[in-house]
Amino acid sequence: METQRASLSLGRCSLWLLLLGLALPSASAQVLSYREAVLRAADQLNEKSSEANLYRLLELDPPPKQDDENSNIPKPVSFRVKETVCPRTSQQPAEQCDFKENGLLKECVGTVTLDQVRNNFDITCAEPQSVRGLRRLGRKIAHGVKKYGPTVLRIIRIAG
């Protein structure tokens, strides 16, 4: 009788362990990797964008060292995206699009959560300072040439 009771108890325990084991993979499958969370954030940025073309992840900075493995806590991210040849209206995933030659580059910073269900992100993207500075310089030079170019040409003709 005692052996039968122990066997029944062992069977219940095994059943509970089996059920617990089946439940755990589904819970862990809901956690995204750092890269997957950033890719999702980039996809959502494309969906909300009003720009003509899609942007694709170009470079992802490594995740910061954190002891906290809680997938609900926002993780800081930093990455760069580059304009692709695919129009935003296309149904093609950005990851399948080629980068546009001389396409616009954007630096993005913010936070993402690794929880696949919540999937929260707060990302801000902007052109890199050096690109903005060069573009501003180019506009000033073009404006100066347009404004003072004819005068400079007259001076060169007179002097030459």
Swiss-Prot record:
Its main location: secreted. Residues 30-131 form a propeptide. It is found in: Secreted. This is Cathelin-related peptide SC5. One of its GO terms (cellular component) is extracellular space. One of its GO terms (biological process) is antimicrobial humoral immune response mediated by antimicrobial peptide. Residues 1-29 form the signal peptide.
